[in-house]
């Protein structure tokens, strides 16, 4: 064995052998050189010395016939070692999941369904908006009609409470008059009475007295007379006015036939009372200085079947 190894060393370059071995394997060069120098490595006999067959370290034995290295091979022709690595475990390549090819018909059906749903939602929203608008318009129309029917009574109540437009104010209790302070210089006020009717009413309507003089704070009772000249009963209601208009604030009616509807039968004549008082505060109003005449006028209107008033 030693001769064969020596012949091998003579035919090859020792340094090239060692360098090739060290670059291709993990064996320390110093250890391998020491083994060669000390002739502790024995080579196997032919046919392993053939130039075409690699020499495995499994075939290199020491003198005790023990395996030295098991993972390194070298070739005699190329004089270099090659590392024999174990066969790597192949990594399984994931099989791509086939992407399902979308069906054009299904896509078209889905698009059509989405478009139909969107159109239906838009229709519902538009219908709700139209319903809301219609409800608001209906409420507005009802409110306008209600105000038109209630305009005359509301105007009368407003004028009666504020004295606007010469309308007299009502007194709820006769005791209010007694509480007025009459400790002031007073002078008589002349009150003129006037009556009128619409052209359509076949009534004769006039005051029983044309004028009257009274002191501010003094209750005054007067009458108006009305006669129905037809063969059928007629129901009417009267409105009143005061001139000058600024005197209406101080003209308070305690009782008046104009508060209620008046029914007069065929060819019937009735007397209708008016109880009023002129407030003494009129004497303290600078705007009323020089005012000594006040006119109280009434006009009758017809009450129709619907409870509304129309001029007659």
From Swiss-Prot:
Coiled-coil annotated spans: none
Cell compartments where the protein resides: Mitochondrion inner membrane
Biased composition (Pro residues): 87-101
Top-level taxon of origin: Eukaryota
InterPro entries: CtaG/Cox11_dom_sf, Cyt_c_oxidase_assmbl_CtaG
Disulfide partners: none
GO CC field: mitochondrial inner membrane; mitochondrion
Pfam families given in the database record: CtaG_Cox11
Transmembrane segments: 132-152
BP-aspect Gene Ontology terms: aerobic respiration; protein-containing complex assembly
Topology with respect to the bilayer: Single-pass membrane protein
Region (Disordered): 79-117
Protein keywords: Copper, Membrane, Mitochondrion, Mitochondrion inner membrane, Transit peptide, Transmembrane, Transmembrane helix
Molecular function GO terms recorded: copper ion binding
Spans within the Mitochondrial intermembrane topological domain: 153-312
Major localization class: mitochondrion
Biased composition (Low complexity): 102-117
Function: Exerts its effect at some terminal stage of cytochrome c oxidase synthesis, probably by being involved in the insertion of the copper B into subunit I.
Similarity field: Belongs to the COX11/CtaG family.
Protein name: Cytochrome c oxidase assembly protein COX11, mitochondrial
Organism: Dictyostelium discoideum
